[in-house]
């Protein structure tokens, strides 16, 4: 931007750097988009819109009510999953609304974060819909984060990384606070949404492969699709911040992230053992542990970090198709009702 000069030429005033953390906050939808990848992710997320009540739970209800429909081990998996996921997506939404959104200044990134928070609400709605459809004890399911150690420990791992950003006086702009934001982004993208959900996804989709709990599993497929996008967006956001602030990505910080990832792996392996103490659905806890490590290695690679256990193979190759967005089928072909934007509104 130029400033008039009495000497007959304009002085050049240097603009402040435009970065994820220093972009001018604007409500102008025509503002230049410096990060087209973020805007594209927003458009992709909007194209994947779904609502839980569009999916029939009729077969699931009949199976759950049948005394011989599911084994006790299978029922344990379903209830443990719902117990963790109902809390987890609420934590994810709180992290966005109370923390991350306030600190990320690029408008196209904020646009995606708003969409992501809405999707977290849809996921919570989905778990409630499943719980109500099956007639489960809501107190048992919704209090699992207090009463089940393997769930409580995962939540306890996440909470400090929400609280630091949600503190009223927290503000980026120093190396310490910028690092705190980057750390929180990585924990939620790569460890929560990118790791803590995947034992549950594999278990419920293993039921689906045996034609069990098909309505719940279809919702989990939609959620898997959403969470894969959340994970990838969060990691892309973290990587962009690393590029713009290379001093943050120093050896000590990288070592800290690797240690957090190892802790997250231990917590998810403990959860896998708790949810399936015996082999079920052709799965066992040892396979799940290898799967957790395989997923953790993928997240490390996305962050340009060394794998925690190099070369660990994927014990569930049938999950690969669902983890790769480019190969996912169009789940929306199986909806019980055609989605119409605003179709349920009456303006009279």
Positions of PLM-derived features:
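Non-heme di-metal
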Residues: 2-348
């Amino acid at each position: 931007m130029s400033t008039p000069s009495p000497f007959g030429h304009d002085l050049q005033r240097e603009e402040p750097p435009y970065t994820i953390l220093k972009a001018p906050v604007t409500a102008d939808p025509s503002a230049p988009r410096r990060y087209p990848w973020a805007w594209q992710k927003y458009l992709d997320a909007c194209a994947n819109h779904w609502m839980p009540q569009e999916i029939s739970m009729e077969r699931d209800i009949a199976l759950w009510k049948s005394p011989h429909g599911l084994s006790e081990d299978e029922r344990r998996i379903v209830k443990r999953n719902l117990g963790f996921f109902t809390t987890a997506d609420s934590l994810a939404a709180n992290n966005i609304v109370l923390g991350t959104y306030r600190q990320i200044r690029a408008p196209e990134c904020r646009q995606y974060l708003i969409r992501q928070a809405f999707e977290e609400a849809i996921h919570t709605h989905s778990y409630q819909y499943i719980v109500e459809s099956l007639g489960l004890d809501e107190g048992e399911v919704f209090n699992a984060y207090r009463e089940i150690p393997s769930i409580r420990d995962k939540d306890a791992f996440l909470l400090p990384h929400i609280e630091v950003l949600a503190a009223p006086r927290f503000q980026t702009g120093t190396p310490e606070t910028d690092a705190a934001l980057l750390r929180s982004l990585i924990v939620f993208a790569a460890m929560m949404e990118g790791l803590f959900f995947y034992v549950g996804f594999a278990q419920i989709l293993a039921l689906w492969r045996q034609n069990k709990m098909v309505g719940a599993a279809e919702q989990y497929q939609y959620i898997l699709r959403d969470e894969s996008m959340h994970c990838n967006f969060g990691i892309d956001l973290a990587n962009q911040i690393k590029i713009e602030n290379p001093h943050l990505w120093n050896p000590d910080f990288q070592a800290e992230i690797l240690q957090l990832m190892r802790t997250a792996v231990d917590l998810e392996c403990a959860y896998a053992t708790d949810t399936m103490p015996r082999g079920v659905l052709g799965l066992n806890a040892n396979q799940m542990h290898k799967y957790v490590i395989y997923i953790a290695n993928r997240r490390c690679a996305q962050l340009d970090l060394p794998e925690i256990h190099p070369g660990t193979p994927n014990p569930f190759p049938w999950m690969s198709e669902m983890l790769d967005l480019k190969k996912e089928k169009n789940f929306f072909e199986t909806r019980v009702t055609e989605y119409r934007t605003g179709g349920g509104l009456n303006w009279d």
